[in-house]
Amino acid sequence: MKTFVAKPETVKRDWYVVDAEGKTLGRLATQIASRLRGKHKPEYTPHVDTGDYIVVINAEKVAVTGAKRTDKMYHHHTGFIGGLKSISFEKLIDKKPEMVIETAVKGMLPKGPLGRAMYRKLKVYAGTEHNHAAQQPKVLDI
C-alpha cells in the first residue's frame, strides 16, 4: 500500500468566514493556522499547501486574557541603527486591528516559501464587512 501524496493542482480549497468577536486571540490563531495549513484534511501533505482560505471579521473585537491588553508589546526593527520600534497591544488594536490577528497567525505558520503561500490565504477585516461574498464562504465556528 502506497502513501497518498497530495498534488498542488488537485487540492480543493474552500472559503470560510470566522467571527473573532469575543474570541481569545491565541486560541483563535491556532485554529486558523491549522486550517491554513490543511491539517484538518485527510489528504494533508506537509510539503504541499492543502489549506483553505480564511476570512476573519471583527478583528477589532478580539479578546486577550489577563493584563495583556496593556502589557503585551509588539516589536519590529526598521533595519537602521537604534531602529527597534515597539507598540502595545492596546495601541495596535486601535491603530491596525487586523495586524494583531495577522501577526499571531503568521508566527504559527512555517517559515519559508510554503508558509508565505499559506499566509496569503488569510484575509482579516476590522469590521463586519468583507469583499469576498462572491466566493460564498461558509461560516466556521471556532
Curated annotation (Swiss-Prot):
GO biological process: negative regulation of translation; translation
Stretches assigned to coiled coil: none
Alphabetically ordered keywords of this record: Ribonucleoprotein, Ribosomal protein
InterPro entries attached to this UniProt entry: Ribosomal_uL13, Ribosomal_uL13_bac-type, Ribosomal_uL13_CS, Ribosomal_uL13_sf
GO terms for cellular component: cytosolic large ribosomal subunit
CDD domains in the cross-refs: Ribosomal_L13 (cd00392)
One protein family per Pfam: Ribosomal_L13
One term of GO molecular function: structural constituent of ribosome
Function: This protein is one of the early assembly proteins of the 50S ribosomal subunit, although it is not seen to bind rRNA by itself. It is important during the early stages of 50S assembly.
Entry similarity comment: Belongs to the universal ribosomal protein uL13 family.
NCBIfam families: rplM_bact
HAMAP family documented for this protein: Ribosomal_uL13
Subunit structure: Part of the 50S ribosomal subunit.
Protein's name according to its UniProt entry: Large ribosomal subunit protein uL13
